[in-house]
């Protein structure tokens, strides 16, 4: 796996494949898409597995892995990235010559872990247990960060002090790149890495430093590169539909212009949608669109965050919007669970709350809302699937004095998607539920075609309306 990736990237570039062999890459819009980095893609795939809570040791016998996906990750993906890190430590020349030495010594014979390590150490001339043991016999993670950076003018030179902190449990030497104000760069190795969770690197330069980066070539399996540089790279690209672009060393900003028009309320509303994302850890959408009549700025923001070292497969969601008709703010915690990693039913547990402090009666009434009050709802939710059937159970309740209305609701939702027969696929949805209340339920919390409440519909930018204009079909 490592050899194939190295060859393909060396021959065809960082994307790692021959564009001429793939249909569509010379046509719009893929012609203008940024190409992915093949190494980065493999690293992200391994990181998703490593932070899932289901990671297993590479050295485990194949028949003891919990399932085929774990076997695949530990037989191919992780070992290939381990060898990539070994090349980073030894350098290209010594790494490739050590692999050649291994082949010549044991060619056409069955070998084990000890013979591989002994042959490489024999050729390199140093012990590498500190490198191989954590990779092969543990699931320790690597995550270095620059915790502080100081630069002080000292006569005709600059004194630089860099504090490096290890947030993981695996240790590696680091290539440290210093970028200067004149655009030039300088690189040096920090090798005081063994069993150090924090260290200070001090050096001087005649040039004024601008930024510092750890592992600038992104060769290590460092879980989070946002803390590897004093100046994180940013990429601004048009938000092409279907684009999947996740560089390891850069935060990606996608942008797209939007246009809304509603002759009754907001008139013509040109706007801009911006998305900020970084790998498996963060995603934020911000959308604003000023209305010409009335002159008002409407907006919508939502996103999620995921911790690097804690709470595996747990996302923290947030959202807020001020749209024609209603204003809302909400938060949610979501936890996913599988019996093993992948290929089994995923159980998604979540809990959250949302608050609607005010309404615009002109638009809210048209949506079926009751604008005479405010609404605060807390909820718990479970979702899973059995084959082609999705199941959902939701329990919701208003939050005391924060809500004008008082009710409790329990809802079961089932959806089914059939296979295509003669090019036709059918979708079915069943909603069953009950609402308990001593007074009238506001229209925004009634059952409708979207599910639990009209809020499910409102949170979709392209459906801020009745169900195709039909009130009877909507409710």
Identify the residue ranges that each predicted region occupies.
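Short amphipathic beta-strand and strand-loop transition segments with alternating hydrophobic
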Residues: 147-153, 257-261, 353
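Strand-connecting loop/turn motifs
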Residues: 92, 127, 250-252, 281-283, ...
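Outer-membrane beta-barrel initiation region
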Residues: 172, 182, 200-204, 215-318, ...
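Noncatalytic modules at the cell exterior or secretory-pathway interfaces
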Residues: 206-210
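C-terminal outer-membrane beta-barrel translocator/porin domains of Gram-negative envelope proteins
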Residues: 315-320, 330-334, 346-352, 359-475
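Solvent-exposed beta-strand/loop surfaces of large extracellular or lumenal domains
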Residues: 173-201
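Conserved short loop/turn motifs at secondary-structure junctions
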Residues: 100-107, 117-120, 288-292, 319-321, ...
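Hydrophobic alpha-helical and helix-loop surface patches within well-folded domains
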Residues: 1-163, 171, 181-184, 212
């Amino acid at each position: 796996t490592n050899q194939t990736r190295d060859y393909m990237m060396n021959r065809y570039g960082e994307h790692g494949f021959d564009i001429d062999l793939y249909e569509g890459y010379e046509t719009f819009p893929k012609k203008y898409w940024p190409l992915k980095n093949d190494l980065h893609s493999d690293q992200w795939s391994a990181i998703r597995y490593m932070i899932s809570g289901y990671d297993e040791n590479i050295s485990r016998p194949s028949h003891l892995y919990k399932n085929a996906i774990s076997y695949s990750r530990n037989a191919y993906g992780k070992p290939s990235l381990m060898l990539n890190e070994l090349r980073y430590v030894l350098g290209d020349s010594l790494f490739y010559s050590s692999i050649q030495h291994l082949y010549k010594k044991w060619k056409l014979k069955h070998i084990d872990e000890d013979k591989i390590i002994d042959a490489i150490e024999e050729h390199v001339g140093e012990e590498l247990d500190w490198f191989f043991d954590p990779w092969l016999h543990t699931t320790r993670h690597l995550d270095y960060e620059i915790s502080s950076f100081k630069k002080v003018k000292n006569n005709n030179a600059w004194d630089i002090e860099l504090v490096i902190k290890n947030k993981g449990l695996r240790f590696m030497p680091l290539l440290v790149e210093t970028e200067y104000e004149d655009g030039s760069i300088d690189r040096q190795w920090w090798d005081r890495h063994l069993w150090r969770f924090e260290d200070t690197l001090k050096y001087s330069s005649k040039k004024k430093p601008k930024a510092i980066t750890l592992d600038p070539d992104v060769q290590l399996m460092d879980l989070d590169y946002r803390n590897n540089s004093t100046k994180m790279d940013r990429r601004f690209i048009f938000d092409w539909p279907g684009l999947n672009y996740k560089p390891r060393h850069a935060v990606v900003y996608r942008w797209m212009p939007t246009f809304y028009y509603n002759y009754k309320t907001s008139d013509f509303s040109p706007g801009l949608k911006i998305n900020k994302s970084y790998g498996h850890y963060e995603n934020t959408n911000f959308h604003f669109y000023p209305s010409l009549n009335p002159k008002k700025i409407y907006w919508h923001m939502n996103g999620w965050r995921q911790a690097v070292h804690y709470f595996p497969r747990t996302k923290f969601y947030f959202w807020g919007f001020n749209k024609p008709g209603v204003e809302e703010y909400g938060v949610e915690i979501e936890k996913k669970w599988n019996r093993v990693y992948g290929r089994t039913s995923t159980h998604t547990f979540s809990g959250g709350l949302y608050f609607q402090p005010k309404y615009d009666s002109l638009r809210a009434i048209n949506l079926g809302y009751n604008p005479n009050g405010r609404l605060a709802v807390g909820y718990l939710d479970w979702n899973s699937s059995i084959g082609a059937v999705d199941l959902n159970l939701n329990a919701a309740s208003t939050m005391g004095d924060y809500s004008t209305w008082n009710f409790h609701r329990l809802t079961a939702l089932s959806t089914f998607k059939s296979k295509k027969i003669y090019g036709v696929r059918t979708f079915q949805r069943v909603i069953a539920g009950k609402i308990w209340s001593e007074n009238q339920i506001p229209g925004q919390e009634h059952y409708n075609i979207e599910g639990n409440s009209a809020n499910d519909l409102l949170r979709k930018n392209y459906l801020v309306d009745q169900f195709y204009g039909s009130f009877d079909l909507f409710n």
